[in-house]
């Protein structure tokens, strides 16, 4: 009882305050209050008006009241209180007085409507749902939506939005909130709608906006309708019969809504959950089994569609059908298309792996040149990519949670790489390496210092990365070439043989002579060079202001510490060991391709840090040797037995005083390699086979004679000082569209410039909007990442589908382009919406 009394007092205070507001000002005012149910008849005496009197109107004193207000007292303000409903116009003798007076409403609905400026014709809606406004917080949330123009739908959507705590009065936002609850049959928002008699209103709006009609509407069936309608727009074939009944006639609205849901940072995870639910509920994999893969190429509603496309690609590769196409797209193009679609976060690695596998399978027809010069040239320009794609394949393969489904493909890749590529290449390589003039056909590692360092005036940093083979160096080249401050060139040189660390490191130092003692110790100018200090001593004999450092010692140094190292130095040798350190151990050799990726990133980051923080801008990156890696364990037939002998025996080479004359082995004199009269002989397999040696790993090897082991990169990098202007790849509309006349429109866009070191790849979101920023179409994603120099190859076609609604021909509509990264609007293009039967 006390609570009820307190509420009544609170209402009376609110009414008192509102009435005093009505009578503010100098001008005389008359305010009529028809208290339909005489709710305040006992309280009116307690009303305290600051600038008006209370006049009590009775049903039988209307004439006198009119006389009193218009003749007897024309000066004072009056609140005319009537404890009964307002009479009909014909029976109300004060109707003309009301025309220049004001009505006051004290029921909750009227107070609410007056406060917000809601037209009285919508009072029945407010009264029907007055229970909704009984809660202060809920009512405040309705106020906070700041609805500018009230109509029946906005009021309903406002109440739904208040329950769902949306930020705007948008039915799409309400639906997003409902779908995000996580439950289908027992949904907290749907239950709350029922509580406030808004349940049927919600489903009516679902029919109006999305065309969802059901005798007994349910959230499950609504979600099915959304997803199947969305799927229908991108499946080029005919939908299976079992799904056709779920396709809504309001496809434009659904496509726009679903695009926004799928592409939203806030909702994309929920989209994925809903997609999985629908896929399982309808057994989409089974339902789509009779559709052709090309009919699903552009559909990314469900992740299981990716599984269908992936299975098709794998089957084509296993059949070595590299010319197979989907909708006139090659396998590599299909991989590119699908890897940019919605589920790429979970499927991207698989597509990248398949793309690499494709390049390996193409190599099944590998033809190796006959001459050594041609072998060198072909390797530097194209063959290195086979090794690179083999590395990429395993990098992605090893990162999969479950790679068992691709075991047959892995076996094919391994077989082609080893038997069709390596075996053919190494046989001819090792025939050429023994030719008399071979060592004059390209720069030699043993001449590195004289060819690259001697005579340089600028401070130079030489980064020697252990086992950084040519193809990995080429990836580093690609990474740095995209840096606008980088001016970079890549060359190659032929390493010493045997191609192992101690001899390779010696060859990179300045020297007058390199020798190998009888106990196989490598000496530079007669001095040991097997550690950092001894190498520094040798380096300083040729360059006073020089130093040798380990990468691990400087990688985390602060700016001041880096400057202390480099200040006053003319030459710095940095020794980096990521690849060899991982590959040379049996328990980590299968991680070598991960190490390659890490090495590229570490070296690129180090160059940028030193350039920015240590006033050093010239860098040379090279390696002591490369490596061969094969995943399958070696068979005993791949191992060459070595008889007991006094020799330096490694898996890929033997150094001894005598040549080995056996099948599969070639020999070269150490004196020829080191340019001296050393009588020792280097023996090496002419294939990728190894000598049988105990201990260590077997898959990662180096020291032998192959392009993979002996062709090492030499990257010459100059980093520009200061700021370099860069910009995003721009896009422009090619299609001369001024008027939209169809619910589905295809437009062409061009990427203005090719991606380069100063033009950065950019992702754009494109969609149509009204002048009040309402999205009226689906959202298209354009990846402006083409490096094609031919402008015709940088043209993209995008499909747009419009909301099913009425469009005002006199209103402004635009195609807008947004930078996905920054969210910034890049441009907008004005169009007239002239959809037949839809505009007004």
What positions do the PLM features span?
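…; additionally, a secondary subgroup of soluble metalloenzymes is captured
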Residues: 1-460, 469-619, 623-840
């Amino acid at each position: 009882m006390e609570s009820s009394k307190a509420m009544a007092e609170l209402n009376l205070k609110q009414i008192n305050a509102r009435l005093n507001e009505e009578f503010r000002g100098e001008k005389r005012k008359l305010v009529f209050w028809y208290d339909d149910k005489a709710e305040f008849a006992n309280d009116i005496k307690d009303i305290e008006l600051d600038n008006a009197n209370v006049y009590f109107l009775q049903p039988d004193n209307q004439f006198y009241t009119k006389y009193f207000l218009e003749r007897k007292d024309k000066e004072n303000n009056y609140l005319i209180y009537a404890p009964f409903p307002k009479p009909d116009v014909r029976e109300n003798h004060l109707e003309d007085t009301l025309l220049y007076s004001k009505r006051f409403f004290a029921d909750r609905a009227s107070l609410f409507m007056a406060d917000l400026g809601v037209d009285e014709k919508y009072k029945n809606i407010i009264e029907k749902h007055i229970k909704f406004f009984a809660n202060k917080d809920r009512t405040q949330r309705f106020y906070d939506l700041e609805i500018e123009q009230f109509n029946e739908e906005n009021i309903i959507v406002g109440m739904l939005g208040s329950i769902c705590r949306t930020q705007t009065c948008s039915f799409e936002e309400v639906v997003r909130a409902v779908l995000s609850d996580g439950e289908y049959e027992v949904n907290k928002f749907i239950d709350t709608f029922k509580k406030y008699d808004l349940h049927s209103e919600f489903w009516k709006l679902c029919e109006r906006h999305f065309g969802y009609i059901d005798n007994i509407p349910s959230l499950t069936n609504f979600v099915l309708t959304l997803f199947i309608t969305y799927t229908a727009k991108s499946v080029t074939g005919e939908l299976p019969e079992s799904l056709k009944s779920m396709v809504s006639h309001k496809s434009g609205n659904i496509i726009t809504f679903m695009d926004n849901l799928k592409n939203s940072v806030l909702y994309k995870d929920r989209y994925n959950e809903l997609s999985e639910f629908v896929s399982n509920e309808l057994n989409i994999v089974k339902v789509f089994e009779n559709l052709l893969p090309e009919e699903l190429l552009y559909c990314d509603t469900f992740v299981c569609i990716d599984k269908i496309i992936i299975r098709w690609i794998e089957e084509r590769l296993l059949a070595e059908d590299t010319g197979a196409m989907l909708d006139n797209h090659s396998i590599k193009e299909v991989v590119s298309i699908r890897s940019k679609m919605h589920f790429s976060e979970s499927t991207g690695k698989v597509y990248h792996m398949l793309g690499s596998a494709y390049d390996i399978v193409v190599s099944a027809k590998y033809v190796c040149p006959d001459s050594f010069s041609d072998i060198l040239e072909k390797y530097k320009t194209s063959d290195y990519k086979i090794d690179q794609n083999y590395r990429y394949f395993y990098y992605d393969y090893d990162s999969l949670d479950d790679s068992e489904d691709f075991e047959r493909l892995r076996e094919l890749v391994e077989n082609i790489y080893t038997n069709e590529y390596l075996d053919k290449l190494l046989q001819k390589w090792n025939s050429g390496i023994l030719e008399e003039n071979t060592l004059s056909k390209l720069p030699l590692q043993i001449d590195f210092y004289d060819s690259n360092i001697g005579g340089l005036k600028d401070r130079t940093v030489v980064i020697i990365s252990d086992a950084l083979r040519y193809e990995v160096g080429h990836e580093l080249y690609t990474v740095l070439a995209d840096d606008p401050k980088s001016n970079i060139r890549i060359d190659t040189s032929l390493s010493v043989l045997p191609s192992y660390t101690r001899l390779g490191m010696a060859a990179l130092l300045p020297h007058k002579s390199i020798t190998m003692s009888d106990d196989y110790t490598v000496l530079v100018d007669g001095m040991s060079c097997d550690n950092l200090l001894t190498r520094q001593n040798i380096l300083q004999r040729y360059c006073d202001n020089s130093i040798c450092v380990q990468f691990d010692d400087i990688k985390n140094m602060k700016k001041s510490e880096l400057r202390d190292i480099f200040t006053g130095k003319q030459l710095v040798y940095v020794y980096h060991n990521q690849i060899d350190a991982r590959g040379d151990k049996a328990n980590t050799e299968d991680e070598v391709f991960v190490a390659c990726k890490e090495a590229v990133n570490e070296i690129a980051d180090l160059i940028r840090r030193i350039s920015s923080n240590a006033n050093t801008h010239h860098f040379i990156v090279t390696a002591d040797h490369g490596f061969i890696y094969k995943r399958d364990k070696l068979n005993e037939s791949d191992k060459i037995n070595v008889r007991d002998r006094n020799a330096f025996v490694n898996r890929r080479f033997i150094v001894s005083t005598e040549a080995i004359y056996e099948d599969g082995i070639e020999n070269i004199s150490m004196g020829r390699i080191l340019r001296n009269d050393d009588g020792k002989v280097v023996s090496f397999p002419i294939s990728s086979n190894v000598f049988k040696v105990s201990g260590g790993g077997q898959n990662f090897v180096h020291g032998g004679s192959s392009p993979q082991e002996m062709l090492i990169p030499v990257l010459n990098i100059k980093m520009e000082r200061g700021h370099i202007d860069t910009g995003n790849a721009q896009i422009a509309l090619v299609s001369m569209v001024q008027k939209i006349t169809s619910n589905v429109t295809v437009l062409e866009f061009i990427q203005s410039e090719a991606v380069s070191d100063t033009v950065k790849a950019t992702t754009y979101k494109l969609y149509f909007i009204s002048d009040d920023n309402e999205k009226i179409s689906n959202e298209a994603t354009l990846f402006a990442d083409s490096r094609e120099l031919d402008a015709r190859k940088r043209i993209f076609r995008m499909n747009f589908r419009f909301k099913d609604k009425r469009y005002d021909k006199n209103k402004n509509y635009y195609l807008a382009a947004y930078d996905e990264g920054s969210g910034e609007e890049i441009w907008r293009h004005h169009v007239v919406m002239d959809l037949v039967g839809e505009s007004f």
